[in-house]
Amino acid sequence: MAYCASRFHTVRRRTVAVKVGAVGIGGANPLRLQSMTTSDTQDVDLTVRQCIALAEVGCEIVRITAPNVPAAKCLGSIREKFTAAGFGAVPLVADIHFLPSAAMEAVEHVEKVRVNPGNYADKKRFAAREYTDAEYDRELQRLNDTFSPLVRRCRELGRSLRIGTNHGSLSDRIMNRFGDTPLGMVESALEFVRIAETHGCHDLVLSMKASNPKVMIQAYRLLVERMDAAHRPYPLHLGVTEAGDGEDGRIKGAIGIGTLLLDGLGDTIRVSLTEDSVYEIPVARAIADKAMSLWGSTPPPAEDLRLDRDPVVAINPGSWDPVDPLHFSRRETTTLQFSDRCAAGPEQPPRVVVRVPGVHDLAQTAAGFAAASMDETPAEGWLLSIPDAETLLELQRILSKLAQLPVADGRARPVGAPGTPDDPAVRIRQADSRGSIGAGALPGGFLALELAQSITIGDLARFEPAVCGSLVVCRWFDASTAAELTAWAGFVRASGHFLAIDTRPEEIPALADTLRALGDDRLLFTVSRLKNHAVGAHALGAYRALAGQLLLAGSRAPIWIRNTAANAVRDDSGYLGRLIESSFLTGGLLCDGLGDLVSVETETDPVRATKLAYNLLQGAGARISKAEFVACPSCGRTLFDLQSTTQRIRAKTGHLKGVKIAIMGCIVNGPGEMADADFGYVGGAPGKINLYVGRDCVQHNLPQADADDRLIALIKEHGRWMEPPAPIGTA
């Protein structure tokens, strides 16, 4: 059973429509935007002001925590005052953990109740034990007895329910039988779905949240596969939990949410950020608009889709997709050694290529990288567009000048070891204002030339890149140029270069015989532009199809992911739009195990483009270049200022490459939600912090004023600390 109609074009999943007050989710409704208040729910006036602020920036559904019965009672006053302020059509949702009594009070006042199936009727003991079938059945009966009263009351009042699983807060029962896995997340939700259905309750929305986008994506896909096989086309609420703040938080959210939206899944979204919640809505709006632009027409209305009908109508039945969408594994590829310090292949991290604006900008660009702090985020390939043969000759002159090549014998100045006078980075920093020294030897990288079709093999044969080493020659090929492909492949092999074949997946069958004859040892593939932007077409699908066609052709050549304006779902001028587009494409492919090189060519500032590429790699879990922070969005349960705390801890520990630190406002988003974090900083009581190593709490009730230093001491104790590097120019 497929989890979506197509992985190559966006076809919206058919669902029943669920009403949350006056707002419809799923069916023919648009994507709905959600967020959550951060105030203490018992501070009614402040909570109402936050609800109003969210509604005014476009939030369509507002969630409020109800951690106990007194807080749940306050939802009545909040609803009344919010309605009196003119927002009666904006529904409120109660967020419930642990206390069924709070849920029973909350359902009297709000349009929807969200329950976390991992802790609604269970207390976490993190106990390893085997459950017999009889014991498991007794646990399910206990769950039924606890959850059924809420379901019945929801039906009586016309309320809807969200069954919202979180990866890190699965019950001991689920953990011991299914593990801390996407399957465990799905089973956790389905336990509650089955109970709701026994009472005739079908006003259900489901979610599968995790801080790891790969886990989140796999869980939603598995959930849909299981639900649709059982004819349960309930709507989905999408979100990446504990994504953090700033660019990293936006990237994680866009990767997880965007990948699923392009798969056609999702009916309502929240971009969780450790920031004021009003800042979540513009990001969610931008993501939703891009996704909805791919919907050719609205799906059938709710009355045309019954729970006993198959909601999936598959298209592209002849397409071959080599990816297992439910289990991550990286595509097997041939290794290409571009330089002594840079290779692409299955044992290598995805490599970062940066576009240089023009040949005359090469020196300035390289000098800019030397001046910036880029040791952990270097440009590993330098991409230049070559529109004609004259530009190629001009590049030759520039490289010769920059490398200070002696004219007499053509020998290049040697590339020295780091710190020596011939170290390229040293030479770049010593460059004069005209950039006359240094960029000829590109530090640790290779030169990629995107050639116009008018440039011939003869033109390139006259090009002597001197100290640049092997070139990656990027050129367009299609079914009409198979003979040219053979000639170009022969030339690059004889010259020690590499050929990046820019094409579209539909061209590969016509080139297959040629590719089999050529072998993979000098080839890589890319898609720089879609054939057209037909309804539902997107570059993510094109690259997936490319991987499938290469498999059919017997090719294991690496794939270069190029984020270009021609590949965008919608070409936006703003940085947020470019970030979202690159998260959709690069993040989605990396989470499927596809991609060996990455370039973000929509960002014109090379340093910024490179940093964005590395942030994309980190967000997708494909390459780690800095510390990672798992930080929950604030809510009424939070016991300290999450925003300032996250920023403060990042400033002190952000240089710790490969260390993952969870910053959680309270226990509900604490040890369970941290998943695979190395260290945790969790609110234990007002003004008190608990520190964790993994899931284990090792220090309790520390004064918040001391907690930062104690966290650093804990990191040192476990051998993960290093001193931050000195700023450039101070060493």
Predicted regions and their residues:
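Glycine-rich phosphate-binding active-site loops on the catalytic face of alpha/beta enzymes
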Residues: 58-63, 110-127, 262-278, 381-384, ...
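Beta-strand/loop-dominated core regions that host nucleotide or nucleotide-derived cofactor-binding catalytic loops
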Residues: 686-689, 696-721
